[in-house]
Design a protein with these regions (language model features):
Chain A
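Positively charged n-region of N-terminal signal peptides that target proteins for export
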Residues: 1-5
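Bacterial N-terminal signal peptides
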Residues: 7-17
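Early exported N-terminus immediately downstream of N-terminal targeting peptides
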Residues: 24-102
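Solvent-exposed loop/turn segments at secondary-structure junctions
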Residues: 75, 92-93, 131-132, 160-164
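Surface-exposed, charged secondary-structure patches
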Residues: 96-138, 189, 193-196
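Low-complexity, intrinsically disordered terminal/linker segments enriched in charged
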Residues: 156-196
Length: 196, 262
């Protein structure tokens, strides 16, 4: 009886403890957006902003996972050395591309509006990038990987229904198909992008 | 000749709608999945794409740059009147897709905005609570009736398309677009060809200006700009055909399972 009581209390304690440290996907998105907005609204050089945005991206995006996802079927033919090389090159490419895209915006206002739990691994968080004089309102959906509730990660951005991960995957497939599936051609393209 | 063409189109539509009487969203989704659409003449398409980029740099981009400097109310007035004109294609397509309620709403929008909204400059209908406007075209109607997209093609000046969507555009010039009929095809006292062509050019400039930063950003950060534009176009068409704002399957989870288990 005493033992049962102890287990019961322990379970309650654990569940409270676990919940206390899990992050709701919509809160995760809003806080990520707030962090990025803060950087973008600061009086910093573009280069400094890019450096800060890269840190945010490294902490909140599943860069390695997206890299291998966007490689499509070609990842099955990679040996361990190539996999390592690709992961490194993709990370460099992604951080540069992601941060320089974001750095173009000054003080973007994003409102998180809703969420839809797809399954225990994924939640879609709906948000809106507010209209400005230069562009209309833009709907942005975030595909959040929630397998580890304490450390949710962004796996895709869906802008007005268009998936960035899917676009990237098709872009990589096109580079590979134009070069007879030679992975080195993709490596070279990624290298060149990061250098320039 | 025109009569024959229209008969062929309607026969095809009728046949396909019978054949796919049991068609559901999933089949349409599958048929229009970007990865399933072949780029049959990629070399030719890439050449046309390069030509369009030169044209964009020489004409559309500079004009859009100036257009963006116009006061915001003026630009939204232009955008509204272009949208209002496009109702003339949207309404018949609402009917072709069996969406009679939307056809009614869009007819209301057209009447209100053309009259009270002064030739569509003001979107009075939106303020009166009518549904948000969504464009429809003949390519979308063909797709709803089960016609597959065919190959991906890039048209000179007009940009990305598919065989089905191109045929859909041809319908506009063969009686499907009332605006074309009263400006170019028939000699009316009130409108002339210049009205039609200037509305089309303005529509292109308005689109370019609205997406100015997005296009520049995409071009700058793409490894293969042609492939990115193709992917985005085909994803967008898939969404429009299904008339959904829901997120269509964006990632294959089996891919992720394989990545995670390694």
């Amino acid at each position: 009886m005493k033992y049962n009581k102890f287990v019961f209390i322990l379970l309650i304690y654990l569940s409270i403890f676990m919940n206390a440290y899990s992050i709701e996907p919509e809160i995760f998105v809003q806080s990520t957006v707030n962090r990025a907005s803060k950087v973008l609204s600061q009086d910093l050089t573009k280069e400094k902003k890019i450096e800060k945005l890269k840190i945010i991206a490294e902490e909140t995006v599943d860069i390695r996972g997206i890299g291998f996802y966007t490689l499509g079927g070609a990842r099955k033919n990679l040996n361990d050395v190539d996999k390592k090389k690709y992961a490194k090159l993709f990370k460099k490419y992604f951080l540069k591309s992601f941060s320089s895209r974001l750095a173009e915006y000054t003080n973007p206002e994003i409102d998180v509006q809703n969420k839809k739990i797809l399954n225990e691994n994924y939640t879609i968080v709906n948000s809106v990038l507010k209209e400005t004089n230069e562009r209309p309102e833009i709907k942005i959906d975030w595909r959040i990987y929630t397998k580890n509730p304490k450390n949710p990660l962004i796996r895709d951005l869906i802008i007005e229904g268009l998936s960035l991960a899917r676009t990237q995957k098709e872009e990589f497939a096109s580079i590979l198909s134009s070069n007879n599936g030679d992975i080195n051609s993709l490596f070279k393209t990624l290298e060149n992008f990061s250098k320039n | 000749m025109l009569k024959r063409f229209v008969i062929i189109i309607f026969t095809t539509l009728a046949l396909s709608s019978n054949v796919v009487a049991g068609t559901d969203g999933e089949l349409i989704l599958k048929k229009n999945k970007p990865s399933e659409i072949k780029d049959c003449s990629e070399k030719f398409n890439r050449a046309t794409f390069a030509f369009n980029q030169v044209l964009d740099g020489a004409i559309f981009k500079p004009v859009a740059t100036v257009y963006r400097k116009l006061p915001s109310p003026l630009r939204s007035g232009v955008g509204n009147s272009i949208d209002n004109l496009s109702n003339l294609i949207t309404i018949p397509n609402n009917i072709l897709q069996g969406d009679f309620a939307k056809a009614g709403v869009n007819t209301g929008r057209l009447v209100l905005n053309t009259t009270v909204g002064i030739f569509g400059i003001f979107d009075v209908a939106q303020q009166l609570g009518l549904d948000e406007y969504e464009k429809e075209d003949f390519g979308q109607s063909f797709a709803r009736h089960g016609i597959g997209p065919g190959c991906y093609i890039v048209l000179p000046v007009l940009g990305p398309s598919t065989v089905r969507d191109t045929i859909g555009s041809v319908v506009n010039f063969t009686g499907g677009d009332a605006w074309y009929n009263i400006t170019v095809k028939n000699d009316t006292q009130y409108f002339s060809e210049i009205d039609y062509y200037s509305s089309k050019v303005t529509s292109g400039v308005d689109f370019r200006a609205k997406n100015f930063n997005a296009i520049e950003n995409l071009e700058k950060n793409s490894l293969d700009f042609y492939a990115s534009v193709k992917s985005l176009y085909l994803q967008d068409r898939q969404q429009k055909i299904l008339n959904t704002k829901k997120i269509i399957e964006t990632q294959d989870d089996s891919d992720w399972e394989e990545i995670e288990n390694k």
